[in-house]
Design a protein with these regions (language model features):
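Short acidic-hydrophobic, aromatic-tinged amphipathic segments that line or gate anion-handling sites
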Residues: 1, 27, 62-65, 149-159
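RNA substrate-binding interface of SAM-dependent RNA methyltransferases
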Residues: 38, 92-177
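Boundary-proximal intrinsically disordered activation/regulatory segments immediately upstream
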Residues: 1-50, 132-133
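Amphipathic alpha-helical repeat scaffolds
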Residues: 29, 106-114, 222-228
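Active-site regions of enzymes building and remodeling cell-envelope glycoconjugates
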Residues: 56-67, 97, 168-169, 183-189, ...
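Active-site/ligand-binding-proximal alpha/beta "capping" segment
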Residues: 171-221
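Glycine/small-residue-rich loop that forms an oxyanion/phosphate-binding "nest" at active or ligand-binding sites
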Residues: 61-86
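Structured adenosyl-cofactor binding patch, chiefly the S-adenosyl-L-methionine
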Residues: 120-121, 137, 142-149, 204-243
Length: 243
């Protein structure tokens, strides 16, 4: 059974302010919880139904009913467990390979998908400016399906980082060179912008190349692609050229 203090802690961690203050975050769902445990994240609290608890030998568990779990979960259909882990502090940014950079991406689902995308394509470093949604937002963590354990997410002064970065910088925009005729080096930074406004003028000015995904529709009336979709297309093309 959950204590009042445990309930209050879970509620607090829905807010970025308290996640940063306490250096904690929430993970929901059996698969994701197991992945964070296996990745060695330090556990603060684990609540689970009896069904899930039987698979977690050796872990300190607070047993709850499905109804109790439902009351503290942010999901419509909670999946047998909720855990609180300590945030992991990543070391310095290694400037090699393909790096993905995000300029003010706001939607948790988009960031979660982009983290999964990095994991799938072997991109280990994701750079975000401070206005990009928090990677420890519960909706982001849920959308990553455990991929957050394998991708280092860094929040930095993006313009400052790009200004001193030694790798070629390619920013995605509607007005740029054709993605499919661009030759990318093995090591580079791919920059994606805000869902509504794209990349900022400051970041655009720092880019070595501006790249666009060409439209093939006859009427050419589609305004833009979802940022996660665009990211998938771009990274896939870069990896294709690597091979």
């Amino acid at each position: 059974m959950l204590s009042k203090n445990q309930v209050k802690l879970i509620q607090k961690l829905q807010q970025k302010k308290y996640r940063n203050e306490l250096n904690l975050f929430i993970v929901e769902g059996k698969k994701s919880i197991v992945e964070f445990l296996q990745a060695g994240y330090r556990l603060e609290l684990l609540i689970a139904t009896e069904v899930f608890a039987t698979a977690l030998n050796g872990q300190p568990i607070t047993l709850v009913s499905k109804e109790e779990l439902r009351k503290v979960s942010s999901l419509k259909n909670p999946d047998e467990g909720l855990a609180i882990f300590h945030q992991r502090q990543h070391k310095g940014i290694l400037q090699e390979g393909v790096i993905l950079a995000l300029d003010n991406v706001q939607d948790p689902g988009n960031l979660g998908t982009l983290i999964r995308l990095c994991d799938w394509f072997g991109i280990e470093t994701l750079i975000c400016n401070s206005q990009t949604v928090d990677c420890y937002n519960p909706k982001v963590v849920q959308a990553t399906m455990g991929s957050l354990t394998r991708v280092a997410v860094h929040y930095v002064d993006l313009a400052g980082f790009l200004a001193t970065c030694t790798l070629p910088l390619y920013a995605m925009d509607l007005d740029g060179e054709n993605l499919y005729t661009t030759e990318f080096p093995e090591d580079c930074v791919l920059i994606l912008g805000n869902e509504a406004n794209g990349i900022s003028l400051e970041v655009r000015a720092l880019a070595d190349g501006i790249i666009t995904i060409p439209r093939f529709g006859k009427l050419q009336q589609t305004e833009s692609l979802n940022v996660a979709m665009a990211g998938a297309i771009v990274v896939s093309q870069v990896r294709k050229l690597d091979n």
